[in-house]
């Protein structure tokens, strides 16, 4: 019923339309509250991970921001970019399962220790797989160390088997990691980080993602968040 004829002949909007609009407004408010709650929860989880790994404090937040900026440069819509930023906040959640002495070791990891560290991608999936996110967050987290030629981990996926969000997180992760201090080495700088992704464009890293990242930083003057 779209309209209601009043007894005096005046056409007025039907009550059901008013009710529908009110319901839509209430739903929109609820969705915003839910999004805020989810962001707060993911931030808390990210903080918990970084408490165990102080050398990468802020790493997840920065990766999320970089990934979102790259996605925006690629033409992704705002909601999808925001979701990717949130995924960045928890992309290393699986490090909870890695012994702290490995996370903070001041020298390079042994082969055995490296295998334990690599387990964080699968552990992240296992932690998040039953959470009803509106996107395949757990799968994206599991794939953020996969590489286009199949040389990544944990599944050895290649090409289109890797979800677009994971491809962007992979590049954002490399750019942030190489530009930041680590227990076993000083920061190598943005120039070296860009060289890494450009030299391996199409082999390890998605070419479209690399092109967008390079343009964002070298042409648009994007500065990595501190």
What are the residue ranges of the model-derived segments?
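Metal-dependent catalytic cores of enzymes that make or break cyclic nucleotides
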Residues: 30-32, 39-226
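General helical structural elements
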Residues: 5, 24-25, 56, 171
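A broad, low-amplitude sensor of folded, mature protein cores
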Residues: 9, 20-23, 194, 218
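Output-coupling edge of small sensory domains
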Residues: 1-4, 160
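PAS-family sensory domains
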Residues: 6-16
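PAS-associated C-terminal cap
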Residues: 15-29
């Amino acid at each position: 019923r779209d309209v209601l004829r009043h007894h005096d002949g005046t056409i007025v909007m039907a009550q059901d339309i008013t009710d529908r609009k009110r319901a839509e407004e209430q739903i929109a408010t609820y969705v915003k509250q839910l999004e805020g709650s989810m962001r707060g929860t993911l931030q808390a989880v990210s903080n918990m991970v970084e408490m165990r790994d102080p050398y990468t404090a802020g790493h997840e937040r920065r990766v999320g921001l970089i990934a979102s900026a790259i996605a925006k440069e690629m033409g992704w819509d705002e909601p999808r970019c925001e979701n990717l930023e949130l995924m960045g906040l928890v992309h290393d959640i699986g490090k909870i399962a890695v012994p702290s002495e490995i996370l903070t070791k001041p020298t390079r990891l042994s082969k055995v220790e490296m295998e334990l560290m690599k387990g964080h991608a699968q552990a992240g999936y296992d932690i998040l797989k039953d959470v009803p996110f509106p996107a395949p967050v757990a799968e994206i987290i599991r794939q953020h160390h996969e590489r286009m030629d199949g040389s990544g981990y944990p599944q050895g996926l290649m090409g289109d088997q890797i979800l677009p969000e994971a491809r962007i997180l992979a590049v954002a992760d490399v750019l942030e990691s190489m530009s930041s201090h680590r227990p076993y080495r000083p920061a190598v700088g943005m120039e070296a980080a860009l060289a890494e992704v450009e030299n391996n464009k199409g082999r390890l890293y998605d070419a479209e993602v690399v092109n967008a990242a390079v343009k964002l930083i070298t042409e648009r003057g994007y500065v990595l968040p501190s």
